[in-house]
Amino acid sequence: IYPRDCPQPMKEEYLLTGSLEPTNEPYAIAKIAGIKMCENYYRQYESNFISVMPTNLYGPNDNFNLETSHVLPAILRKMHLAMCLENDDWNSIRKDLDKRPIENISGKASNEEIINILSKFSISLIQNSANVSLTLWGTGNPKREFLYVNDMADACVYLMENLDANDLYSMEVTHINIGIGKD
């Protein structure tokens, strides 16, 4: 929800200070609208609404589909599959693919089909070696912060029990970032 070229770490006051990332704009606008609705309900009705903005969340029942997942679940799954491939642990690879097929390739596929689909997602056996090459993606320059979903829930409960909306809005803050906020 923060501007595309927002300084790091992101601070609450950076909201609405620049252009949004075009690929994320509809999501960001919806989130910003929710924050503004809570803010204006407080101003008009003195409702005790506090908006929070989590960092990248992960946890149980996350989406580990390499075609549609977010960053951390994809990284975890790719690392797991690469480790299994390097250890020649075909049973674990097949079990993983039976639970979450990749482009309709399940654990019932041949070793060659599995190796081909894994290489499409940058998990490859190094030729004439037992080693595996794993490429995540990008340059490695973007900074990301991750938070376990139960920690997010704990933060929300803490805020509900210890912060009044008046405290927040009197500081001219419309929402609270949940995360470490450090480089």
Predicted regions mapped to residue ranges:
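Short aromatic/basic micro-patch
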Residues: 51, 146, 183
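Heptad-repeat alpha-helical coiled-coil signaling segments
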Residues: 62-63, 142-144
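Conserved S-adenosyl-L-methionine
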Residues: 179
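Catalytic helix-loop patch of NAD(P)-dependent Rossmann-fold dehydrogenases
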Residues: 1-58, 62-73, 80-81
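Alpha-helical substrate-binding/gating segment
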Residues: 43, 57, 73-135, 144-176
